[in-house]
């Protein structure tokens, strides 16, 4: 083993990534078919119909499932969902798969987290690569807005209350 006087894997700091970290964002869970992914880079566009736009990993199974099924569920997560968010983000092990970390209900849009009070059933409108992400633009078809106590927020690379 070698002891380094500096970081052993020096990388230049990415100013765009640092800007994104300073913005922070509400953590959501996107599911479609048998796939899911935590997403904190998202926005909602008001209109008739309303829309949800999310930046997702272009190599993720979620992208493939959304494009194949054309529908999905977007749920807003709470502090109690931290472990589930880590499992769907691929940062912690999930023996048996990430869907074993929660209780699920089946909807016409796919599986939704049963104890997430706010969720939207969405229909995919378009998927475009932008930067190192895929921009999923989805029409809100069904929406339930519930209690928002103790939201799960991601800022500077960690979860906050």
Where do the model's predicted regions map?
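Basic, polyanion-binding surface patches
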Residues: 2-161
